[in-house]
Amino acid sequence: MKLLFIVNPISGDIDKEPFLEEAKELCSFYGINFLVFKTTGKQDTLKLNKILDDFKPDRVASVGGDGTTLFTAISLLHENIPMGIIPLGSANGMATELYVHPEPIQALKDILLSQMIYGLDLL
């Protein structure tokens, strides 16, 4: 499995590095090929599109809050790649509404292990 983490380093004013370190250990332990893309606010869409073309992930994990979730969903709109949410923003409203586990590492385990994939309507 190839997993792409899309990380907003400043969402919710929460340090993402402790989560990323634990996530890297988990992925390495299970032999999951992963890549971390950190948003900067400068040409993120262009950079992400290139990564999607080059890396060709099997799944994407959106790491941040609602804004990161929206950015990730829009970026994957015309792709056939399942997306999961790692709730590391300030309110995590979308993650809460979608019953995503509130603990980031457990949410990652759900993304990695779940075979239940659902479509969502985007307006």
Where are these regions (language model features)?
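Catalytic core of DAGKc-family lipid kinases
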Residues: 4-6, 30, 78-82, 86-123
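ATP/NTP phosphate-donor binding region
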Residues: 1-60, 70, 74-75, 106-108, ...
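Glycine-rich beta-strand-to-loop/alpha-helix junction loops that act as flexible
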Residues: 9, 63-65, 86-88
